[in-house]
Amino acid sequence: MDLYLNQAEEFLEEKRPKFDEMVKNLMKLPEISLTKDIAMLTSLLITARQCLNLAVQLYRNSEMLQSKVRATLADWEYVMREKKISCLSDAEWVDKNLIPKMSKEERDLKAQFYHKDLSDGIQKMLCFQLEVDSLKRAVYNKKEDLERVRKDLGALIWGVRTEELLNNKVAPEDQEKVKAYLSTGVKDVDDYLNMGKRS
C-alpha cells in the first residue's frame, strides 16, 4: 500500500503544475469555444478524472489524497463557472437528452464505475456526477452540438481507450484532429485505471 501511496503522490505532484497551467490559460481567454479549445478542455477533464480514479481505487481511506482530488475538481468547477460555459443547468435535461444517446459500451463503462465498492461520499464524486456535470457544463444547449460533443469529448470523459476513440468514436474527418489533441501529453486513461490491479 505504501508503494501505491507513493505512486499517487508522484502522479498528483507531476500533474498538478500542468493542470494549474491549463487553468491559467483558460482563464485568459475572453470566451471558450468548444471546437477551438477542446484540447485544453479534454486535457483538463482527463487530468481531473485520473486524479479522481487514483484516489478512489487505491487510496479511498486517505483523507489527504481525497482533499487534493477535491481541490482539483474545485478548480475545474471554478473555470467552468467563471468562463460562463455552464449553458445547461438541469440534470433532468441531460438524463433525457444526452444519456439515451450513449452507446451500450458507454453505458457499460458507467456501470463499471458505479458498482465499485466505495463509500457513499466518494461514490458520489466518482459515479455519474463528474461525467454528467462535466458534460452538462461543456455542452452548449443546441441539439446540433450534442452528437459532435459526444464523439469528440464524451468518449474521453467516459474512459474509452484511445484506440477505441480513434477507431469507433470519432468521424474519420476528425481523427487527425483528435490525434493532435492526444499528442499534447494526455496518456491513455487505462494506464491509470489499471494501476491498482498491478501486483
Model region roles, listed by residue range:
Residues 16-57:
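Short, charge-rich amphipathic alpha-helices with coiled-coil/heptad character
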Residues 3, 180-199:
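Short acidic DE-rich linear segments
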Residues 100-103, 108-181:
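Charged, alpha-helical coiled-coil and adjacent rod-like segments in eukaryotic scaffold subunits
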Residues 1-18, 22-25, 29, 198-199:
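Eukaryotic intrinsically disordered, low-complexity tracts enriched in Ser/Pro/Thr/Gly and charged residues
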Residues 13, 42, 46-49, 53-56, ...:
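Generic structural signal for well-ordered, non-transmembrane alpha-helical segments
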Residues 37, 87-89, 119, 171, ...:
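Intrinsically disordered, low-complexity coil/linker segments enriched for acidic/polar
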